[in-house]
Swiss-Prot record:
SMART domains: ACTIN (SM00268). Component of the Arp2/3 complex composed of actr2/arp2, actr3/arp3, arpc1b, arpc2, arpc3, arpc4 and arpc5. This is Actin-related protein 2-B. It is found in: Cytoplasm, Cytoskeleton; Cell projection; Nucleus. GO terms for biological process: Arp2/3 complex-mediated actin nucleation; positive regulation of double-strand break repair via homologous recombination; positive regulation of transcription by RNA polymerase II; primitive erythrocyte differentiation. Belongs to the actin family. ARP2 subfamily. ATP binds at residues 160-162, 214-218, 305-310. It comes from Danio rerio (Zebrafish). The lineage of its organism: Eukaryota, Metazoa, Chordata, Craniata, Vertebrata. Its main location: cytoplasm. One of its GO terms (molecular function) is ATP binding. PANTHER family: ACTIN (PTHR11937).
Amino acid sequence: MDSQGRKVVVCDNGTGFVKCGYAGSNFPEHIFPALVGRPIIRSTAKVGNIEIKDLMVGDEASELRSMLEVNYPMENGIVRNWDDMKHLWDYTFGPEKLNINSRDCKILLTEPPMNPTKNREKIIEVMFETYQFTGVYIAIQAVLTLYAQGLLTGVVVDSGDGVTHICPVYEGFSLPHLTRRLDIAGRDITRYLIKLLLLRGYAFNHSADFETVRMMKENLCYVGYNIEQEQKLALETTVLVESYTLPDGRVIKVGGERFEAPEALFQPHLINVEGVGVAELLFNTIQAADIDTRAEFYKHIVLSGGSTMYPGLPSRLERELKQLYLERVLKGDVDKLSKFKIRIEDPPRRKHMVFLGGAVLADIMKDKDNFWLTREEYQEKGVRVLEKLGVTVR
């Protein structure tokens, strides 16, 4: 709470999950799927102890997703369906989750890098007009990740459910001209795993199965350090084969798919996406930065988001970066490679790094009035109030 006893809320709206809670906390109060569902056919009024309503949100919608038509209001980190987004916020602030009176609270929201201005204007409008928060702040996710790590300068590789961003931050400011986006993230890897399992003869086709495969992915998948070696092991031995029990009790065996699915992050062509993979994109981003800042960036690469949780990802990233640096910068001169310093930070709580950084920032700033966009300022200036955040509003 701030000095006037008002709650300070932090809400990280991801494509796949909402993480929300309070300033100063070490963990989100609630984490739930960012989805809205409507019944396909209205037959039974109850399933187990969950009542089927015309509109189901979050956890409830996730549990009954086989009976619902589900929509994710956000796509690739950007709001696409504002009506459903409002339902999601109603659920977040309402009795089901935070149970707050938004008129007496401040809120810190997060946004992806390169968020369109129109999107940001609409968020501000909804927060002040619909929910009437006393103060609002919108922070860029990559900057919050670095705050959570105690840094002001570094490159954030943020890979969530809907989008992967590579975002350099210098002295606490994100550098939009250097920010790169890769439209491959958790959801695409889950889809690819479904396809690979289909080739093995296991059919998963329903949206309820999607959740099952997502959990399987989180439990079994890893990133191969040396892909040729992994493929050899998968072909010639059974060391990679793991059994996995599905919710209905069936047991399936998963082998090479365990590393083949996340490989899409490094080789986008596997899922028919044009462009370079995450390692080369990271290399290109740092090399495009000012020459004086490159060494700092290479030493402060911070992983963030659920799709960076695969075992083996940090070491593979480091290996590929060194290889690219050797080929393209040192022109193959191995002796000079020892001077090339690189450090990839993979904090254990990186799944919720953005929320943690937001909770730190909101706590430090809770009583600094000039930090927040206030309701009075909004009533006076409308969306032009965003200029206070250093955003040019047309």
